[in-house]
Amino acid sequence: MLTELALGLFALWIAIFSQALHKIEEGHVGVYYRGGALLKAVTNPGYHMHIPFLTTVKSVQVTLQTDEATNVPCGTSGGVLIYFDRIEVVNFLSQDSVYAIVKNYTVDYDRPLIFNKVHHEVNQFCSVHTLQEVYIDLFDKIDEEIKNALQEDLVKMAPGLYVQAVRVTKPKIPEAIRLNYEKMEAEKTKLLVAQETQKVVEKLAETERKKAVIEAEKAAQVALIHQKRLLSEKETEKLLNQMEAESNLASERSKADAEFYKAQKQADSNKILLTKEYLELQKIRAIASNNKIYYGDSIPQAFVMGTTQQTV
């Protein structure tokens, strides 16, 4: 009987102990409710004890987590209703702010602070923009707009809860509109391809033009060099001819000077040589060597006047 009682008490103790012992995983903290009231105790990861049946344990994540809002409606300013398949909000809760946020918003704080706020901000954004802006022009800014709006409100409503990033999928639009947009994108792509092709053609034409300019400049430079060479040859030839002419002129002048000098000297020599006595001597010699006989009245004058009249 005592043995059975002891075994029963031991089993009861084991059951109570197993209910009292709980584990908090890494990256989480434990919060406790007793009688529906939140206790101020916040426990770290590990094993802990609590009073079974009176105290309830809740685990709250304090590392990065991703909250996902699905099928979020978006009514544009033009009256077209579209849906975002999925909007992901990456956030984390500071351990020091766990008690205050859980007390104000329960352990499901992400429902009022993130999910509901995402729907509200999406509607606010879509209501002031057209379908074109939401679907194409401003789509890359939606995530940043939602992130900034969420963080601005969290600073006021739940300090310690931070939004790291927001990811937004492409919205679903009515099929007819989607097909029109696809056609429009296809035409835009064709236009871009045509523009790029035109740029390539223009680039090639510009390259050919530059090549032609370079070739023309090269030909002009070659022609200029050739012309300069010809001019240089002409100038050299002219200079050589001029030098040759000057040399010939100098030679002729030298010859003329020599002839003039010779004639001048001969004249001076003759002037010195042809004296009156010498001329008389030569005349006598000429008469003496002349075997012709002269007759007439003018014979004496031949010797006196030096005339050459004769009669045979």
UniProtKB/Swiss-Prot annotation:
Keyword entries, A-Z: Endoplasmic reticulum, Glycoprotein, Membrane, Signal-anchor, Transmembrane, Transmembrane helix
Known glycosylation sites: N104
Cellular-component GO terms for this entry: endoplasmic reticulum membrane; protein-containing complex
Gene deletion effect: No visible phenotype, with no change in growth rate at 20 or 26 degrees Celsius, general morphology or lifespan compared to wild-type. Does not affect brood size, embryonic development or defecation rates of itr-1 (sa73) mutants. No change in development or survival compared to wild-type animals following exposure to ER stress inducing agents such as tunicamycin and dithiothreitol.
Residues in the Lumenal compartment per record: 25-312
Chain ranges passing through the membrane: 4-24
Residues in compartment: Cytoplasmic: 1-3
Tissue: Expressed in the germline only.
Membrane topology type: Single-pass type II membrane protein
Record text on subunit structure and interactions: Seems to form a multimeric complex.
Family, as annotated: Belongs to the band 7/mec-2 family.
Family matches, as PANTHER family: ERLIN (PTHR15351:SF3), ERLIN (ER LIPID RAFT ASSOCIATED PROTEIN) HOMOLOG (PTHR15351)
Protein's recorded name: Erlin
